[in-house]
From Swiss-Prot:
Pfam families attached to this UniProt entry: cEGF (PF12662), EGF_CA (PF07645), EGF_Tme5 (PF09064)
Protein's organism: Bos taurus (Bovine)
Major subcellular location class: membrane
Gene that this polypeptide is encoded by: THBD
Disulphide bridges: 21-32, 28-41, 43-56, 64-72, 68-82, 84-97, 103-114, 110-123, 125-136, 143-152, 148-162, 164-178, 182-191, 187-199, 201-213, 219-228, 224-237, 239-253
Residue ranges constituting the EGF-like domain according to the UniProt record: 17-57, 60-98, 99-137, 139-179, 178-214, 215-254
Cytoplasmic side: 321-356
Example of a GO biological process term: blood coagulation
Residues bearing attached sugar chains per UniProt: 271
UniProt-recorded name of the protein: Thrombomodulin
Length: 356
């Protein structure tokens, strides 16, 4: 029994090694070989006997990892398959990997032009199209839905800038808007095409000869107590050596008036210096008192204003006389048209004999 017990213990699955080969093949997974009263389990050449002495398993370093170019997939006892990376296919020898010409596939993986690369491919679009999310689409117009007041001009593939018509320039701080601009002594006026007599000029200019804008020479009005330089659409005043603001550029050289009009030195950050006048076309110009020769356009404006005042006074006089109950003939003579004057003369001629 003891021997049998030992034999039974030796045959148990807990005991390592093979049993007698005549009993269920010694418990070996692959092959059992007995010699000189001892039994041993054998495994295939590409497998190794495991710790229990009966099972067969893959060795730690399987030779397929050196045989396959990319990857080795083990399945079953001693079996393997070589696998290639994406973009490659297994060669005829079942071990090497060859590049796949993706562009030769049908349908083509690209919407327009396909360029095959090692292990992959690249999609390109025809001239005038852009590749967006794998699709070739018309490029987005940089000027689409712009807010330019006059005209939009593309800059590159995605930017744009607003341009203005001749005689206009972008407004500083609002480049989508345009304002009249003249950097010369005279420029064409901006006239209404339906009403050619209605024209406008840039700031610092005046209508002259109907459709021409002429620069106003502010220096002729003695507005600058120092050295005055007339500029297109504006002017600059350089204070003289007898001024507390000597050498500074502004619109007034009296420090008292400068401080009253522009604020205290604290308003300038404690420097005590008045700000430099802005660039031409943006100068805040005070209303100069006419002290020099007037321009022809100014004289025309004064004449029109005077004539309008006379007409208004005559109309007021007529209205007052009507309220006072003046005779119709006298009022019509003063305020009526020439046709009514002839009728009044006939009436007066007829009334004279009646009075006699």
């Amino acid at each position: 029994r003891g021997a049998r017990g030992e034999t039974e213990g030796r045959w148990s699955r807990e005991a390592p090694g093979a049993w007698a080969c005549g009993v269920e093949r010694g418990g070996c997974q692959h092959e059992c070989k007995g010699s000189a009263g001892a039994s041993n389990c054998l495994c295939p050449a590409d497998a190794a006997l495991q710790a229990d002495g009966r099972s067969c398993g893959l060795p730690a370093e399987h030779p397929c990892h050196q045989l396959c170019e990319h990857f080795c997939h083990l399945h079953g006892l001693g079996n393997y398959t070589c696998i290639c990376e994406a973009g490659y296919q297994l060669a005829a020898d079942q071990h090497r990997c060859e590049d796949v010409d993706d562009c030769a596939q049908l349908p083509s993986p690209c919407p327009q032009r396909c360029v095959n690369t090692e292990g992959g491919f690249q999609c390109h679009c025809d001239t005038g199209y852009e590749l967006v999310d794998g699709e070739c689409v018309d490029p987005v117009d940089p000027c689409f839905d712009n807010n330019c007041e006059y005209q939009c001009q593309p800059v590159g593939r995605s930017e744009h800038k607003c341009i203005c018509a001749e005689g206009f320039a972008p407004v500083p701080g609002a480049p989508h808007k345009c304002q009249m601009f003249c950097n010369q002594t005279s420029c064409p006026a901006d006239c209404d095409p339906h009403y050619p007599t209605i024209c406008r000029c840039p700031e610092g200019y005046i209508i002259d000869e109907g459709s021409t804008c002429t620069d106003i020479n502010e220096c002729d009005t003695n507005i600058c107590p120092g050295q005055c330089h007339n500029l297109p659409g504006t002017y600059e005043c350089i204070c003289g050596p007898d001024s507390a603001l000597s050498g500074q550029i502004g619109i007034d050289c009296d420090p008292t008036q400068v401080n009253e009009e522009r604020g205290t030195p604290e308003d300038y950050g404690g420097s005590g210096e008045p700000p430099v006048s802005p660039t031409p076309g943006a100068t805040a110009r005070p209303s100069p008192a006419p002290a020099g020769p007037l321009h022809s356009g100014v004289l025309v404006g004064i004449s029109i204003a005077s004539l309008s005042l006379v007409v208004a006074l005559l109309a007021l006089l007529c209205h007052l006389r009507k309220k006072q109950g003046a005779s119709r003939g006298e009022l019509e003579y003063k305020c009526g048209v020439p046709a009514k004057e002839l009728m009044l003369q006939q009436v007066k001629t007829e009334r004279t004999p009646q009075k006699l």
